[in-house]
Regions:
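Short acidic DE-rich linear segments
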Residues: 130-134
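Acidic, low-complexity, intrinsically disordered interaction modules
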Residues: 15-126
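Structural detector for short beta-strands of small beta-barrel domains
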Residues: 1-8
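A short, compositionally biased
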Residues: 8-15
Length: 134
């Protein structure tokens, strides 16, 4: 199933919204770990401009792809975090998602893994890793 995944600021986890099927447009799950294939990174410029104008976060960015659901999602994420590249998005700094180490813009990936973690202060945040197999 093709989905749109974003970090839910209120629930502090990833929300998974269906892009097809009878539940199209609805959140079908929440998860601390998500794995997607055939991915595109999406940012609504209008939503980003609203963040810049209001200085308040809103849902305007995320990743679309084919949702991989199953028992091995956690191990696939661990593999991605070792061999993949970390991706980040900050509407105050970037117009799009970027490779964290190089700040190179990124718009697609073969595989994307997302996981919630707690930072040093205990605040829950989302980590995103991507991998292209070309």
């Amino acid at each position: 199933m093709r989905v749109f995944v974003y970090f839910n600021l209120h629930k502090k986890c990833f929300s998974i919204k269906a892009l097809e099927g009878d539940r199209k447009g609805r959140v079908v799950a929440h998860s601390n770990t998500v794995l997607l294939e055939s991915c595109k990174f999406k940012v609504s410029e209008a939503g980003r401009q609203r963040v810049l104008r209001e200085k308040r976060k809103n849902v305007h960015a995320g990743v679309t792809g084919v949702w991989v659901n199953g028992d091995r999602v956690e191990s696939h994420f661990e593999f991605l975090s070792m061999v993949g590249r970390q991706v980040t998005y900050n509407p105050y700094k970037y117009e799009s998602f970027v490779i964290k180490a190089t700040e190179q813009l990124v718009d697609k990936a073969d595989v994307v893994g997302m996981k919630v973690f707690a930072d040093a202060e205990g605040t829950k945040r989302g980590a995103i890793y991507m991998r292209d197999f070309k």
